[in-house]
């Protein structure tokens, strides 16, 4: 497979974003649709937003900014980062990723860091897991959880019982 893409304009003022999904006859595409969205901040010229809907019910909103100090907002989601992914909850699972950033706000979840870093927050079969490169604060459904840097952190969030393991 060879793929060539050319973008008209400067990459640092107009980010280029693409969605790739390998598929075969045995394992067909899981993507149902791809659409694009604009940030609510009309002054953002260097923003790209993609909404990827999967056949399994998962929807990912992908945010890309060339300046991590700027904020992009869309339908109640707010991101202050170079890159972020916000998924909906589907089959008891959910994924949120903050890439080189300090803030991610999504329905029911807030992630904040004092310095730019990467934070992966995943809900798998009803349990939350976190992996972060910098200390972060996570709020889930109004419950504040202060976290350090984690390597394989597990955050259990069941019936108001929260523990974070593997905090370095």
Predicted regions and their residues:
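Non-catalytic terminal regions with compositionally biased, polar/charged low complexity
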Residues: 3-14, 21-168
């Amino acid at each position: 497979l060879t793929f060539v893409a050319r973008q008209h304009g400067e990459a640092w003022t107009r980010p280029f974003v693409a969605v790739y999904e390998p598929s075969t006859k045995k394992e067909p595409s899981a993507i149902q649709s791809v659409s694009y969205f604009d940030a609510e901040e009309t002054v953002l010229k260097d923003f790209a937003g993609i909404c990827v809907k999967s056949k399994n019910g998962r929807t990912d909103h992908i945010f890309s900014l060339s300046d991590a100090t700027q904020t992009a907002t869309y339908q109640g989601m707010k991101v202050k980062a170079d890159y972020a992914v916000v998924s909906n909850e589907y089959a008891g699972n959910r994924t949120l990723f903050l890439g080189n950033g300090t803030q991610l706000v999504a329905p029911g979840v807030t992630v904040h860091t004092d310095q730019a870093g990467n934070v992966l927050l995943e809900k798998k079969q009803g349990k939350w897991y976190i992996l972060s490169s910098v200390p972060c604060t996570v709020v889930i459904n109004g419950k504040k959880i202060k976290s350090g840097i984690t390597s394989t952190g597990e955050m259990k969030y069941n019936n108001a019982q929260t523990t974070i393991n593997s905090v370095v």
